[in-house]
Amino acid sequence: MNNHCFGCDFGSYHLKIYHKDADSYLMQHNMEAVQDKKTMLAYGDEAYAMFEKAPANIQVSSPMSYGNLASISYMQAFLKSLLEKNTKGQLRGSEFFVALPTDMQERSFTMLIQDSNMKPKAVYLIDKPVAAGLGLDINVKEAQGVMVIDIGAETTEISVLSLGGTVIS
């Protein structure tokens, strides 16, 4: 049985994935190129290279907009293709830790992975500010408050962390 573990950050501009077992970090532009509104032609950096240069029948866009999922089906296809390419197709039974923006609905991000063809073992949702604090090697479980500022492509989030959670964001 496969025991891959992935940490995912779905940003408006970049998709960032950490693969724990391989200790590798993958970052791609969060873009997809769709031909005739039905066929995914390219994704990630390859689709970004087509941005504003594609003919009318090829739409190049981001599946995320201001931290919200604009297209769950294209995001699922993008994520699955990207992970299969970089893990040699061994996704069944993987665990996913998803950095969740505080103003987002949990259901859409859970569905993004659970309803895909990847058949994950588990999907864990983590507040994005807590994930950022852990990524910065900050002890977020202390009683002392820590301010974390996440400056993204379309949104900026200021949060105070204490005792393993988000106090205010």
Where are the regions that the model predicts?
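A structural feature that tracks compact, well-ordered secondary-structure segments
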Residues: 157-159
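Nucleotide/phosphate-binding catalytic cleft detector across ATP-hydrolyzing
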Residues: 1-12, 16-41, 46-148, 161-169
